[in-house]
From Swiss-Prot:
Family: Belongs to the ATPase epsilon chain family.
Cellular location(s): Cell inner membrane
Name the record gives this protein: ATP synthase epsilon chain
Assembly information from the UniProt record: F-type ATPases have 2 components, CF(1) - the catalytic core - and CF(0) - the membrane proton channel. CF(1) has five subunits: alpha(3), beta(3), gamma(1), delta(1), epsilon(1). CF(0) has three main subunits: a, b and c.
InterPro entries in the cross-refs: ATP_synth_F1_dsu/esu, ATP_synth_F1_dsu/esu_N, ATPsynth_dsu/esu_N
Coiled-coil regions listed: none
Membrane topology recorded in Swiss-Prot or TrEMBL: Peripheral membrane protein
Length: 135
């Protein structure tokens, strides 16, 4: 049986989850990564995506996050999300609104750097939309 460790998912509004878990899959800035007990220390930014959690009792849970940071230590993991919602509570209109806003930001980009960042963010949102919402 996998060793459990402490995990917390925090948004500006509230603490969404504080529990003993055996595995957390995080949408890191360099791609998805899995945190396990005893993980080497790591701090990374997170991109819009789904945080998947395997609880110590074997149940799984998923949350949609829109950016933030993950702090992983051998003893635990904390995700500080800019915005987070349980996957069952996600509002398709909210994701579409974020996509529409990202398109507007892309259209109004004043430099190549801003345009590139806006394109990446728009792509991340559209990938997220495809991953969690039915076609």
């Amino acid at each position: 049986m996998a060793q459990a460790f402490q995990f917390e998912l925090v948004s500006p509004e509230r603490l969404l989850l504080s529990a003993q878990v055996t595995e957390v899959v995080i949408p890191g800035s360099e791609g998805y990564l899995t945190a396990l007990a005893g993980h080497s220390p790591l701090m990374t930014t997170i991109m819009p995506g789904v945080v998947s959690v395997k609880l110590a009792d074997g149940k799984t849970d998923s949350y949609v996050v829109f950016g933030g940071f993950a702090d992983i230590t051998p003893q635990g993991c904390t995700v500080l999300a800019e915005s987070a919602t349980h996957v069952d509570d996600i509002d398709p209109a909210d994701i579409q609104h974020r996509i529409d806003h990202a398109r507007k930001v892309l259209e109004d980009a004043s430099s190549n750097e801003h345009r590139t960042k806006a394109e990446i963010f728009l792509h991340q949102l559209m990938t997220l939309q495809g991953a969690i919402l039915p076609a």
